[in-house]
Amino acid sequence: MGIRDWPAAERPREKLLEQGASALSDAELLAIFLRTGVAGQTAVDLARHLLNDFGGLRALLEADRAAFSRRLGLGPAKFAQLQAVLEMSRRHLAERLRRDPALESPQAVRDYLKARLRHEPHEVFGCLFLDAKHRVLAFEVLFQGTVDGASVYPRQVLKRALAHNAAALILTHNHPSGIAEPSQADFSLTRRLKEALALVDVRVLDHFIVGDGEPLSMAEQGWL
C-alpha cells in the first residue's frame, strides 16, 4: 500500500501541514525530502532503511557525496538538494544572529554554532567577532585539525580581531566525539587567548564547545 492510501493524518506531508514539522519523526521528515520510494518500498520505508543504514540522521547529513550516492534511492541530485537545504539553514541562523547583540540572544549564538560546527568531522576552531555593542561583525573558522584536536595560534586570532576592528569576540570549537566537555588544553588555550587579546583591549566574552547536545558555555559555567 502506497502512502497515498494511508489515512490523511498519517501521511507525512499532511501531518506536517496539520501539526507542524516538530511532530514528525526523522523518517517522516526524510520521506518528505525523498518524495518517492523505490520498488516495494514507500518513501517512509526507504527513509527508515537509510537512517538505519547510515546510523541515524546526523550521520546521513554528514555523509559525503560518494557515501550518499552509493545508497539506493539517493544520488547526486538528492545530495545537492540536501546541501542546499543545510546551507540555507545556516544562513538563516547567521541572519538571525546579526539582528541583535550576541549577548542579548544567547540561544541564537548556540543555534548558529550548532549548525555551523556540529557536523564537522574534524576539530575546528573559530571566532565570532563583535563590535563595541556586541553586534556580530563576522564569523571565521581560523584553524582546522584532526579528530583529536586543532592547533590554535594566538597571534593569528589577534591578527583577525584587529582586521575586523573587533572590540570583543566569542571563541568556539567543536568536539567530534560529541562530548562537549572542556579539556585542560581548552582551559589553557582560553587563558592564553584572553591574555593576548587583552593587550589590545579586545575582550573574550565566552568560549563555546560544540558537541552532540547544547553547546557548552564556559562563561556560564564560571570558567572565564
From Swiss-Prot:
Official protein name in the record: UPF0758 protein Avin_02940
Keywords, in A-Z order: Hydrolase, Metal-binding, Metalloprotease, Protease, Zinc
Domain MPN: 102-224
NCBIfam families in alphabetical order: PRK00024.1 (NF000642), radc (TIGR00608)
PROSITE patterns reported for this sequence: MPN (PS50249), UPF0758 (PS01302)
Short sequence motif JAMM motif: positions: 173-186
SUPFAM superfamilies: JAB1/MPN domain, RuvA domain 2-like
Binding site for Zn(2+): 173, 175, 186
Record family assignment: Belongs to the UPF0758 family.
InterPro entries per UniProt: MPN (IPR037518), RadC_JAB (IPR025657), RuvA_2-like (IPR010994), UPF0758 (IPR001405), UPF0758_CS (IPR020891), UPF0758_N (IPR046778)
Molecular function terms from GO: metal ion binding; metallopeptidase activity
CDD domains xrefs: MPN_DUF2466 (cd08071)
Organism of provenance: Azotobacter vinelandii (strain DJ / ATCC BAA-1303)
UniProt GO BP: proteolysis
